[in-house]
């Protein structure tokens, strides 16, 4: 598995391409469709994963769907996204082509926030960042739900790589040790 990242938009959101052979998944197409398409190249996109519906994570979604007619995976609890191929994810495993992934509900930053667990990698959106966590003071945010989500991921292996919605990649073990919000 190969993971590529492009930073997009004025909020510097991380959009990811997860590749297996020539197949790929896109995570959080936030903005700047040209940068995203350049990262994709000739990869055959088979799905789009959305961690939550803030504008900086879905800003290029409509443009991307004009190029790729693929399913969108998202926890549509607030009924904010309305697409024909929307898969309203549950907390379970999914298989798309060559990809097997697990969805974890990780509300706190927003009530629609999910983490995608693929291989030894977590795509956390704005749930966990390197040495920080997502804000809980915005619409649909909750301190209590954030703490429940943090406790949920503590059971996973320390060597899991975290790919956040903003900033640098990190490891779960490092965050559990050094991130004061996870103590």
Model regions and ranges:
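Conserved beta-strand hairpin/beta-sheet module of binuclear metal-dependent hydrolase folds
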Residues: 1-43, 114-125
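Active-site-adjacent C-terminal substructures of enzyme catalytic domains
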Residues: 78, 82-85, 105, 113, ...
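Histidine-centered catalytic micro-motifs
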Residues: 48-58, 105-113, 163-169
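Active-site HxH/HxHxD metal-binding segment of metal-dependent hydrolases
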Residues: 24, 31-100, 181
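Active-site-proximal loop/helix segment associated with metal-binding centers of metalloenzymes
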Residues: 8-13, 17, 21, 76, ...
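Pocket-forming structural segment of enzyme catalytic cores
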Residues: 92-93, 99-115
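Metallo-beta-lactamase
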Residues: 24, 111-183
């Amino acid at each position: 598995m190969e993971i590529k990242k492009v930073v997009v938009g004025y909020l510097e959101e991380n959009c990811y391409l997860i590749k297996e052979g020539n197949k790929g998944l896109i995570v959080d197409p936030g903005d700047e469709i040209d940068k995203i398409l350049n990262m994709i190249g000739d990869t055959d996109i088979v799905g789009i994963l959305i961690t939550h519906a803030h504008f900086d994570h879905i800003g290029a979604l409509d443009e991307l769907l004009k190029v790729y007619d693929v399913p969108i995976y998202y926890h549509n609890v607030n009924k904010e996204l309305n697409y024909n191929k929307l898969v309203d994810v549950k907390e379970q495993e999914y298989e798309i082509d060559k990809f097997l992934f697990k969805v974890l509900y990780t509300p706190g930053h927003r009530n629609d926030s999910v983490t995608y667990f693929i291989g030894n990698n977590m795509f956390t959106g704005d749930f966990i960042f390197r040495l920080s966590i997502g804000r809980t003071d915005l619409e649909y945010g909750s301190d209590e739900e954030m703490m429940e989500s943090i406790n949920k991921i503590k059971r996973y292996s320390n060597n899991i790589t975290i790919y956040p919605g903003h900033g640098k990649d990190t490891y779960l073990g490092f965050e559990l040790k050094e991130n004061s919000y996870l103590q």
